[in-house]
């Protein structure tokens, strides 16, 4: 409930430039508010660039598109399906980045849709986390936007302008991970690898789509076996992709046998994307802990070193645990033969989930 007011406030106060890329732009009051806020700043002389994924943002209304473009917003679509570029259809931009005046950046898991207008108070409100960033880390986030913008044919007139700023804006050390499609693990996947390998006490993962690459699954097993408290929180009954849930269950037995805790969030769709390692390190952004994010999609992640941020996110994680069903043993999965068969049938499709 705090996310959109902060984003809208930043947009409405913009003086020079707004850069915005998102995979999800659907419907609802926030979709209308955001479109009209962007349009108003464009009419006020602010350079506004909006990049929408051509697959993920399909449900967006033409009315809101017209509101923005008629006001001077430069709106582009990322990789529209084309018969002569069929290989691009499966490689989307899953990023969610808003940069305002080189001063503020927002990133995380939140899209622009009514599903994110609450905070899991009922099954229609998704549970998610988004972050506002200031300081030097704004620049690489904007550079990540620009990589997608240029892919979509956007111009690059003054894109290289970087304002002078202090090397540090606070007590948090941030590193931005710009991940693109690769045959092997991309940089988001390698960041997951590094954090898992570094963990010594706890590794708490939140992800809406849990279908890790085989190497990441093996690293989670190794972490649990060396005494790390490994927890994975995923959606429970309210998931927007049942296929993904079945595939996650296919791997759950191996993880549970190694001592990993599996938590299913019950109130609504769980869409948080984060890793909390020990008491200092966290990772958040658009990347899911699944094969698509580490092989196929354009993603952005932020790795932060900050004991206070770690503690805050750990507190949120523990609060969410109170609303989860917890599984410690493969026998608790209580799966029917049909579900087992479905999970195995989905094995060849793991890279699609």
Predicted regions and their residues:
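Charged, low-complexity intrinsically disordered terminal segments
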Residues: 1-353
């Amino acid at each position: 409930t705090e996310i959109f007011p902060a984003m809208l406030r930043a947009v409405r106060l913009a003086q020079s430039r707004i850069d915005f890329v998102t995979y999800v732009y659907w419907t609802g009051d926030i979709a209308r508010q955001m479109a009209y806020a962007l349009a108003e700043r464009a009419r006020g002389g602010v350079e506004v660039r909006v990049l929408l994924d051509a697959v993920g943002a399909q449900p967006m209304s033409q009315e809101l598109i017209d509101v923005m473009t008629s006001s001077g917003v430069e709106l582009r679509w990322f990789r529209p399906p084309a018969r002569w570029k069929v290989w691009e259809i499966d490689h989307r931009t899953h990023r969610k980045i808003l940069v305002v005046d080189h001063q503020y950046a927002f990133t995380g898991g939140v899209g622009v849709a009514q599903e994110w207008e609450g905070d899991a108070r009922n099954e229609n409100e998704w549970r998610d986390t988004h972050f506002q960033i200031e300081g030097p880390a704004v620049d690489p986030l904007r550079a990540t936007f620009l990589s997608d913008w240029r892919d979509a044919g956007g111009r690059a007139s003054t894109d290289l302008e970087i304002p002078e700023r202090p090397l540090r804006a606070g007590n948090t050390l941030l590193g931005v991970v710009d991940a693109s499609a690769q045959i092997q693990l991309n940089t988001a996947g390698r960041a997951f690898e590094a954090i898992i390998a570094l963990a010594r006490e706890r590794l708490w993962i939140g992800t809406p789509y849990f279908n890790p690459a085989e190497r990441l699954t093996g690293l989670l097993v190794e972490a649990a076996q060396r005494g790390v408290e490994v927890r994975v929180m995923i959606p429970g009954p309210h998931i927007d992709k049942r296929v993904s849930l079945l595939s996650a269950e296919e791997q759950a037995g191996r993880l549970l046998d190694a001592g990993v805790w599996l938590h299913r969030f019950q109130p609504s769709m769980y869409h948080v994307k984060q890793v909390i390692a020990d008491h200092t390190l966290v990772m958040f952004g658009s990347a899911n802990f699944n094969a698509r994010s580490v092989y196929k999609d354009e993603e952005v992640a932020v790795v932060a070193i900050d004991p206070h941020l770690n503690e805050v996110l750990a507190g949120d994680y523990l609060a969410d645990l109170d609303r989860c069903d917890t599984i410690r043993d493969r026998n608790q999965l209580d799966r029917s033969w049909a579900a087992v068969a479905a999970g195995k049938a989905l094995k060849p499709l793991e890279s699609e989930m």
